[in-house]
Amino acid sequence: MPSPRIRKMSLSRALDKYLKTVSVHKKGHQQEFYRSNVIKRYPIALRNMDEITTVDIATYRDVRLAEINPRTGKPITGNTVRLELALLSSLFNIARVEWGTCRTNPVELVRKPKVSSGRDRRLTSSEERRLSRYFREKNLMLYVIFHLALETAMRQGEILALRWEHIDLRHGVAHLPETKNGHSRDVPLSRRARNFLQMMPVNLHGNVFDYTASGFKNAWRIATQRLRIEDLHFHDLRHEAISRFFELGSLNVMEIAAISGHRSMNMLKRYTHLRAWQLVSKLDARRRQTQKVAAWFVPYPAHITTIDEENGQKAHRIEIGDFDNLHVTATTKEEAVHRASEVLLRTLAIAAQKGERVPSPGALPVNDPDYIMICPLNPGSTPL
């Protein structure tokens, strides 16, 4: 019995058909749309499907892995190429069985790039302040989305899909009827999260946010470019939020998994790149309680400058950059350090009393005499 006749169809046309008839029914449709557009930029997209061989697929793989991402200036990651090959493999399987445009799947036998260990990008306190200020001034909706991500660890798609009828502000719960892993989830809303949501016009029904996935992606890209923040993805905020949950020390792994929606503990491990200084208090059980309190009152780097006052005298100004508007001025350096220590101590104590999160100490520039460490508990030990 002769083989069925192959219908000629270019890979580019097949990708378009796949997006319209198959991908459109998937949760990751938007991501597959982006990947499809990438693939169509390469010569392989002009070939008919039945002419594409394993060599062509391997060549595409190697070309992609050798390229530099123009946004980040870094090589295209193996995970990115794996996802593109997964799209092609799914396309060939559908086309082979249902469309008759090829007899084999050339992607199946090609080696896939190794899975990376995952991103461990953390949001710095400076980046958090700058983004928060930028969004607050430019767009209230972006401001709320940004802080909601840090408070809840929700994915971008979950936040953009929030509806008022699924949010219980009184009891502090946001219901997600459909998530990435196909299961519903109830997300606890902290007091800060509820306060941010209440900044939006509250309705009984409808979407909380008006952004589409592509619209928000563009807004995020513009913000990070204007603020010159490099290699920060919105999904990194989820990683940051989950890491902060671990750093609180009051939630166990199962509770954090219930909040984040992770159904695999192995997946959750990659989100736990905890800052070492916040784990010190657990190393000595005998001093655990003491160190738990002391962890709030750690030294912070500060910039010290000499300024001219209106009376013509010199003065010393100290600014602790990890906090907004935290600075002091005094006639002597010793007095300025002492005042800065007192102000820092008061700021940290108020935050501890209210249970508010404080920024982590930034890095101290190496061999820069204009930077010193301000100790809130012992100003006399602060190096001048």
Curated annotation (Swiss-Prot):
Active site annotation, chain numbering: 155, 180, 235, 238, 262, 271
Occurrences of domain Core-binding (CB) (ranges): 9-96
Residues in Tyr recombinase domain copies: 118-284
PROSITE patterns reported for this sequence: CB, TYR_RECOMBINASE
Family listed: Belongs to the 'phage' integrase family.
Protein name: Shufflon-specific DNA recombinase
Function text: Shufflon-specific DNA recombinase.
One example GO MF annotation: DNA binding
Key words of the record: DNA integration, DNA recombination, DNA-binding, Plasmid
InterPro entries noted in UniProt: CB (IPR044068), DNA_brk_join_enz (IPR011010), Integrase-like_cat_sf (IPR013762), Integrase_catalytic (IPR002104), Integrase_recombinase_N (IPR010998), TTHA1013/TTHA0281-like (IPR035069), Tyrosine_recombinase_XerCD (IPR050090)
A Pfam family reported for this protein in Swiss-Prot or TrEMBL: Phage_integrase
One GO biological process term: DNA recombination
